[in-house]
Amino acid sequence: MEKIKMPHPIAELDGDEMTHVLWGKIKEQLILPFVELNTEYYDLGLPNRERTADQVTRDAAEAIHRLHIGVKCATITPNLQRQEEYGLSQLWKSPNATIRAALDGTVFRAPILISRVKPVVTSWKKPVTIARHAYGDLYKAVEYRVPGKGKAELVFTDENGVETSRQTVYQFSGPGVVQAMHNRDDSILSFARCCLSYGLSVGQDVWFSSKDTISKDYDQTFKLLFQNCLLYTSPS
């Protein structure tokens, strides 16, 4: 039987532990007998990320951007236990977060629909796809373990070095923790356009959810930019 040819390469991102083993078996048994596999290979296993100071992850992100498609196995985002287990020089960042930030992409989680797999909710006849913004927020958050009494503040200094805002986050009376997140208007607009374009391409309604009644600046910005994008792209 003649194998299917791949005229254009894709980025192949190998992973950690059992996903590395399973991906090898999938290729050996289900792909290579039928396809002339044409890939650019990147080993995103934790030992190789340590050896390359995580440069391999950045190279993989560039390859996906250049080739327009990549297949990635699951990877370990190390915690303190993994750092000790693997002898890591530092707690390397999540490869997924690094790749998403480099691509300024959107994560779509869509179900695989086949007749042999019955849905848990049998009355649902159409798929539900979850879209998640892939930039900023928790993945780019700055955190601090508060050792004791003190005041946490949110300060913004403009490009001229002028302090334009100072707000008290919390007056700590004892140990605690504080976290700061951010996002950018251009990235949120890109996310909105991506969601609307995806919905149109697959014929699915787009539902937006936020907590703008509580988060009157952060979530409200998402809501307003989504509204603006929808109004701008809607047919007259």
Residue ranges and their predicted role:
Residues 4, 18, 22, 28-53, ...:
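N-terminal alpha-helical transmembrane segments of multi-pass membrane transport
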Residues 5, 146-180:
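Gly-rich Lys/Arg/Thr-decorated short loops/hinges at beta-loop-alpha junctions or inter-strand turns
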Residues 7-16, 72-74, 177-182, 205-214:
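Short glycine-rich or small-residue beta-strand-to-loop segments that form or flank ligand, phosphate
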Residues 182-231:
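Active-site pocket-lining segments that scaffold enzyme catalytic pockets across diverse folds
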